[in-house]
Structure formats: C-alpha cells, structure tokens
Amino acid sequence: MREKVVSLAQDLIRRPSISPNDEGCQQIIAERLEKLGFQIEWMPFNDTLNLWAKHGTSEPVIAFAGHTDVVPTGDENQWSSPPFSAEIIDGMLYGRGAADMKGSLAAMIVAAEEYVKANPNHKGTIALLITSDEEAAAKDGTIRVVETLMARDEKITYCMVGEPSSAKNLGDVVKNGRRGSITGNLYIKGIQGHVAYPHLAENPIHKAAPFLQELTTYQWDKGNEFFPPTSLQIANIHAGTGSNNVIPAELYIQFNLRYCTEVTDEIIKQKVAEMLEKHNLKYRIEWNLSGKPFLTKPGKLLDSITSAIEETIGITPKAETGGGTSDGRFIALMGAEVVEFGPLNSTIHKVNECVSIEDLGKCGEIYHKMLVNLLDS
C-alpha cells in the first residue's frame, strides 16, 4: 500500500495548488474513484472547487474529509528541493502540502480504493469530501458542501479528517474535538488633539487601559475534562497618526478567543459588551465567528481509529482537542462523529515541509483498518 500512497501523494504535491486553487488535484482523484464506481459530484462555489464522491447508498455513511489547497511556499531558495517537485530524500517526501495534507489525502483515497476493490458490495456508504478552500478564507469550501448536503437531508455518520494530528510519533495523538474561535474587532472613539492640551482632547488609549486590563485577566471558565480553559489573546493594536504630538482619535484593538464548551459565542459577546459599558467607552465592535467548538465523545468512531492505530503501530493514541480550527467544525454541524488523524505536524507550513514515506504507508493501513472496524463488525 505504501508505494500507491506515496505515488499519489507525489502526483498531488507536484500541482502548485495555492489556496483556493486546486490545479487539477481533484480531477486526478475523481478519475481514480470513478473507475471503482464512485458517484462523482462537483460543487464549485466562486473560486473554490469541491468534490463529493460516494460509493454505496445505505447507512452508516463514513466520510473522509480533506483539502487539496496549500499555503504559499515562502522563499523557495530556502528549500532543500523545489517545493513542488515532491522529491524523496532519506525516506522523507518533501514538498508543500506533504504533511498538510496531500500525504494523508492520498492515504485516505488509497485506503478507500483498496476497501472497495475487496468489498464491492459493502454495507453502508464510503464518501470523500474534498475542498480547495481550507487554508485561506474557508468560506466556499467544506461549509458550502455541508450546507448543500443538509438541504438535501443527506447524512454523514462518521467522518475522518486527515489533518496532521500526530505530535512526536505517528499515531500518538488523534483529535476528537476543537475549540471554538471568535475574533473581536474593536474601535474605541476618542477626540483628536494636541498632546500639550490634553484637556481639549480625549485619549482613547488612556480611556481603554482599564478595560484592557480587565479583558485580558478575566477568567472565562476553568475548562473541563475534554478542553483546556478558554483563552484570549490580543492580536493587533493600532492608534495615532505616527506623530508624537497628536492625541489619536481612535484606538483599534483586535482580539481572539479560543473557547471551550463551557461558554458560547453569545456569552462572550455579552460579557465583552458589559465590560465596555462598565468602563464608559464609546465604541464600535465587529465580531467574526470562525467556528463553534465541537466534541466527539468516546464511541464507535473513536474506538475504531484507536483500535486501527493499536493494531498497525502498537501504540494507543491520546485524544486531544487543542490546536487551531479545522474543517471538522463544519462537518460536526451535521451531527456526525468527527475525528482527525494524520501524520506528524512538526513541519507544516514551514520551509522543507516533509513527511516520512513509511508513515504515509502506515496512515493508509490505519484508514483501511478503520473502515474494516466500522463496516465489517
């Protein structure tokens, strides 16, 4: 299986699919799946290409989810080999997207192919949801496919997202949930004036200082058995004209919360508004909710992937919910059990992104055994 996975991964990496461009990756995948009897449905939205492919018509519906888009390479001169050449050096496959996530995407596809070849009349449905809009805006990708499927009352029972979840060794971590993410863009009004005449102006930085102290020290919750406590970080602050003798007219503050299931986005918005009113600030705030938290509790999917990893590698993975957001947050809206598993994430988005070809082969075996555990038991 390893040779098949690596070969497909190389084919995908050689296509420079900087988000939201697909560069023909999904066409390669669709042609392979169509030969095995998968129903292929294209779902393009604006500049994003999405693929929904499925084999079978009954439940349970087991979906593999992934993305063909990648982040920019950075300075290509710093790479040890061209980032889209997909070279193998000392057992490592190099290239942008090798770990995030064309390698695991290839492993999922080969696993599905091998299972269908051996079980053409399998029970349930095997599906693949693939997008070219995960790394950037994430507006016309998985979320639009999910909305389309929900409008048609289509179900996903279990979903494996191939994000690189492993930390130090393949299979040491699977993600069974993610924190929510919400960003506040806050504008605090002042009155511009000369710094020598502060009584004729109103400095929004000075006015906001007590509020910022409260905002950054407030304990939102204590977390729970599945999630760490909610955290807030200020990402950007800007005020002033650049001159040292002008009191600014406005202060801009951008902050982000990664929040757990102990709070909601509405609770966060309400509490921030209460703080702003308490400190008597003139303000305008715009909120951007990137995703709500989701959690897959121990059950059939988590048991199946855990067992597959144990059988293949001999280690028991730890289920975690840390890290950033993923497209799993959208699929969870369908009521599906969602788990993420993939190769090591130590080089993702970096120069010389790479993945072990041995690990890619093991990923394929693990995904295949997961299918066996879910459909043959």
From Swiss-Prot:
Catalytic activity: N-succinyl-(2S,6S)-2,6-diaminopimelate + H2O = (2S,6S)-2,6-diaminopimelate + succinate
Pathway: Amino-acid biosynthesis; L-lysine biosynthesis via DAP pathway; LL-2,6-diaminopimelate from (S)-tetrahydrodipicolinate (succinylase route): step 3/3
GO BP field: diaminopimelate biosynthetic process; L-arginine biosynthetic process; lysine biosynthetic process via diaminopimelate
Residues noted as binding Zn(2+) 2 in the record, renumbered to the chain: D100, E135, H349
Keywords noted in UniProt: Amino-acid biosynthesis, Cobalt, Diaminopimelate biosynthesis, Hydrolase, Lysine biosynthesis, Metal-binding, Zinc
InterPro entries, A to Z: ArgE/DapE_CS, Bact_exopeptidase_dim_dom, DapE_proteobac, Peptidase_M20, Peptidase_M20_dimer, Peptidase_M20A
Alphabetized HAMAP family for the sequence: DapE (MF_01690)
Similarity comment text for this entry: Belongs to the peptidase M20A family. DapE subfamily.
Name of this protein: Succinyl-diaminopimelate desuccinylase
Organism: Haemophilus influenzae (strain 86-028NP)
Organism phylogeny: Bacteria, Pseudomonadati, Pseudomonadota, Gammaproteobacteria, Pasteurellales
